[in-house]
Each structure stands twice: as structure tokens, then as C-alpha cells.
A protein has these predicted regions:
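Residue-level detector of intrinsically disordered/flexible regions characterized by low predicted structural confidence
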Residues: 4-5, 47, 133
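Short, low-complexity, Pro/Ser/Thr/Gly-rich segments in the mature regions of secreted, periplasmic
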Residues: 119-136
């Protein structure tokens, strides 16, 4: 069950942008078909948008730290070792914050759409995609 929940979280957070009428490949109608209210779907979309924004910001912070690390490496690793160690610690903190955020947003999403509902809705979407591809 933990693997399914983590898979759900990774899928949801890896979606760079929301579809206009769904979450990733799963459409609103598929969520409604498995018993999720439109209000809950809208709340999940809001959570995912916030999660995506936070992830992008923290990723930018991490990249900025990595650029600074590279600058100090080019300037001389040995003489900048203390500063490099400090920056590496900061990168670790940002990585930990990203993981904590994923867990936080997963908990928030599961308040509105259960793992079972998501998996059933996803299966409906995949069936529709398969039928559409077979027609072409």
C-alpha cells in the first residue's frame, strides 16, 4: 500500500501542469465516475498547483546552491573547503524540504481523493486512451 501511495504522490507531483479538465491523464469525469465530488477535484487541483510551485522554487534554490558550489570548486577546493561543506549542507536541507513537502501534499491530496479512487479513475482514463489509440 505504501508503494501505491508513494507512486500516486510521485505521479501527482511530477505532473508539470494540470490538464484543463483533469489531473494529468485523469479527467474530471473519470474522478466523478468513481465517486469524487467536483469540489474535491477542484481542491486537489489547487493543492497540486501549490505543490508544483513550491517544488519549482526549491529546485531553483538547489540549482543556485549547486552553481555556487561549482564556483568555489573552480576557485580552489582546498582553500574553500569550509564554505563548500556549508553549501553542501544547505543542499541537503533543501532536498529534505522537498521530500517533506511531498509527504505533506500527499496527505493533503488523500483527504480529498483516496488512493483507491485515484487508481480506479486512472484505470478508466487508460482504458479510454487505449480505445482512442485503437481507433486511429
Amino acid at each position: 500500500m505504501k508503494k501505491i501511495a508513494m507512486g500516486l504522490l510521485i505521479f501527482i507531483l511530477s505532473v508539470p501542469s494540470l490538464a484543463s479538465s483533469g489531473v494529468g491523464i485523469v479527467k474530471d469525469e473519470d474522478f466523478r465516475a468513481v465517486g469524487v465530488s467536483q469540489e474535491n477535484i477542484d481542491k486537489v487541483k489547487t493543492i497540486i498547483t501549490e505543490a508544483s510551485t513550491q517544488y519549482k522554487l526549491k529546485t531553483l534554490d538547489k540549482k543556485a546552491l549547486e552553481i555556487e558550489i561549482n564556483k568555489y570548486i573552480l576557485d580552489g577546493t582546498e582553500k574553500n573547503l569550509d564554505k563548500l561543506n556549508e553549501l553542501v549542507e544547505k543542499v541537503g536541507i533543501v532536498d529534505a524540504e522537498i521530500i517533506k513537502d511531498r509527504l505533506k501534499y500527499q496527505i493533503e491530496v488523500q483527504k480529498y481523493i483516496s488512493t483507491d479512487q485515484y487508481l480506479k479513475a486512472r484505470e478508466l482514463s487508460l482504458e479510454k486512451l487505449t480505445k482512442t489509440q485503437q481507433k486511429q
